[in-house]
Curated annotation (Swiss-Prot):
Function text: Member of the two-component regulatory system SenX3/RegX3. Autophosphorylates, and then transfers the phosphate group to RegX3.
Domain of life: Bacteria
Organism: Mycobacterium leprae (strain TN)
Domain Histidine kinase: 164-380
PROSITE patterns found in the cross-reference section: HIS_KIN (PS50109)
Post-translational modification: Autophosphorylated.
Transmembrane spans: 6-26, 46-66
Listed name of the protein: Sensor-like histidine kinase SenX3
Length: 443
């Protein structure tokens, strides 16, 4: 091959390569463009400004930027929700703080509830902070506010608790001091000494009982995990609660009557549940006239087990029924002093129920009596896959036989329970089977 032929061949090959490159580029260009665009989008993301705006919008603080003319140039939704800004106008208290901030001071303030804009939520306690936005540009101040309502409520509850405890402990301590003085003054009178010594012992026991209940209530309110969760026989809980107050019932000639053993079971801490039910039994005995009846019944209602304690006592006024589970609340203070009540028993019941994912309810009528119903989740669901194997009726069988079962339950109720159940039934009627929607066919 001559030199000329070699050069000619090289030129042809180069031309072919150029043409092939152009054709390949034309065919691949859409893919390359798409890939480059995708990479550009991935690397671009959101801008820093967009990121900051998003953070400010999502944070729980209310934020607003105001200028020297009181014009709000920036704000987030929380600023309006917490009452800092309304109709682009800064709250008066916040504006006074912002004016000081524009002068170079960092200022803290509180939004006054009475002057909070109507658009803000009620019942809030809002604390704020104003400062200069930039030292180089002193035309703008930034104002932050946050909701501290939970903290304020907690502090108020703590103060009330301390005040209540101080007052309640002062009574037995003062009584023991007076009795001790009387003992010293009657040292030569054996009969008087014996009488006062018995009263000192009563007050000392009352004080010790109150301290123990305070410790128990504090532990329950601490939301600690239940220490000993087991599958518990409800009948054992009932029998142990009655046994704790058998002497008190016998002394007052009060009969504590229960329905037949149920075989029902709950999942929880046996000691706590016995304590809760025993507190209900103790109250029923304490607020019932001598020779009357206190009854205890248990039944399954949905996925919960209900234990009801009914007395034929003095009853609870309607305005007091919402407060009976508060610490130290006692509707009949004179009766409570006579019975030695601490005012903590029902509060303990409430927290025991809550710690078991249950509830406590009350029905009462002055002059008729009261029914307290403790509801605790059952150890096993009501409808199970092995209902047929266990011999238990399936969901629809139980639903179709509901009128007969409810009539039998109604007959076994006390008058107070029957009245309460009638009220509940009238307000909660559902004639459709939860399993089949009313067709009468399970599954």
């Amino acid at each position: 091959m001559t030199v000329f032929s070699a050069l000619l061949l090289a030129g042809v090959l180069s031309g072919l390569a150029f043409v092939v490159g152009i054709v390949a580029g034309i065919r691949l260009s859409p893919r390359l463009i798409e890939r480059r665009q995708r990479l550009a989008n991935e690397w671009a993301g959101i801008t820093v400004l967009q990121m900051l705006q998003r953070i400010i919008a999502l944070m729980p603080l209310g934020a607003a930027v105001v200028d020297t003319y009181r014009d709000v140039v920036y704000l987030n939704e929380q600023a309006k929700e917490l009452g800092l800004v309304r109709d682009r106008q800064l709250d008066d208290q916040a504006w006074r703080a912002a004016q000081q901030a524009l002068g170079g001071d960092d200022v803290e303030f509180d939004l006054l509830p009475g002057k909070r804009p109507a658009a803000g939520r009620s019942g809030l306690s809002v604390h704020g902070h104003a400062r200069l936005l930039s030292e180089k540009d002193r035309r703008f101040a930034v104002v932050f506010v946050h909701d501290q309502s939970d903290y304020v409520r907690m502090e108020a509850a703590r103060r009330d608790f301390v005040a209540n405890v101080s007052h309640e402990l002062k009574t037995p301590v003062g009584a023991m001091a007076l009795l001790a003085e009387a003992l010293l003054a009657s040292a030569d009178d054996a009969e008087t000494v014996s009488r006062f010594a018995e009263k000192v012992l009563i007050e000392a026991n009352r004080l010790g009982y109150m301290v123990a209940e305070l410790i128990e209530l504090s532990r329950l309110q601490g939301a600690e995990r239940l220490p000993n969760v087991t599958d518990i026989d409800v009948d054992i809980i009932v029998s142990e609660a009655i046994a704790r107050h058998k002497v008190a019932a016998d002394t007052a000639a009060i009969e504590v009557r229960t329905d037949p053993p149920s075989g029902l079971r709950v999942l929880g801490d046996q000691t706590l549940l016995v304590t809760a039910l025993a507190n209900l039994v103790s109250n029923a005995i304490a607020y019932s006239p001598g020779g009357s009846l206190v009854s205890i019944s248990r039944r399954r209602r949905g996925d919960n087990i209900e234990i009801a304690v009914t007395d034929r006592g003095i009853g609870i006024a309607l305005e007091d029924q919402e407060r009976v589970f508060e610490r130290f609340f006692r509707g009949d203070k004179a009766r409570s002093r006579a019975t030695g009540g601490s005012g903590l028993g029902l509060a303990i019941v409430k927290h025991v129920a809550a710690n078991h994912n249950g509830s406590i309810g009350v029905w009462s009528k002055p002059g008729t009596g009261s029914t307290f119903t403790l509801s605790i989740p059952a150890a096993m669901p009501l409808y199970q896959d092995n209902d047929e194997q266990s011999g238990q009726p399936r969901g629809c069988d139980m639903w179709l036989n509901r009128p007969q079962r409810e009539e039998e339950e109604f007959k076994s109720m006390t008058p107070a329970q029957a009245m309460m159940q009638s009220e509940v039934t009238r307000g909660n009627v559902n004639d459709k089977c939860p399993d089949c929607g009313g067709r009468g066919i399970a599954g």
